[in-house]
Amino acid sequence: MSNVPADLKYASSHEWVRADGDGVYSVGITEHAQELLGDMVFVDLPEVGSEVSAGSDCAVAESVKAASDIYAPISGEIIAVNAELESSPELVNSAPYTDGWLFSIKASDESELDSLLDAEAYLATIEE
């Protein structure tokens, strides 16, 4: 059973979003996603300052099993990336909701959050 924190919003493509305040959101992949991928060996993150659109691929997680695109759950500007992942990509496995975050985004349209799933709805999609 995957851990799905109730205070986050989720995309059906297995990204999570956490409000950090002032229209800034942290993004990562869910515990379920990292379990499917297996041990991370590399994470290719978006460039700080780049603009992303909701649903567009903006990063890649490479594991011992596969490479998987990571999609922007909301539109906006990438304002930070988790530099720790360069030397420690395994943080995505060991702490997907905390130290294994991927990037921070300054939302250009916070109403897009309304189309994301809450924990209960996300759990329902992964238990199908």
Curated annotation (Swiss-Prot):
Q: Name one GO cellular component term.
A: glycine cleavage complex
In terms of domain of life, where is this protein from? Bacteria
Signal sequence segment: none
Q: Which UniProt keywords apply?
A: Lipoyl
In its UniProt entry, the species of origin is given as Yersinia enterocolitica serotype O:8 / biotype 1B (strain NCTC 13174 / 8081)
Q: Where are the transmembrane segments?
A: none
N6-lipoyllysine is carried by which residues? Answer: 65
- What family does this chain come from, according to its entry? Belongs to the GcvH family.
Q: How does it assemble?
A: The glycine cleavage system is composed of four proteins: P, T, L and H.
| Protein name (record) | Glycine cleavage system H protein
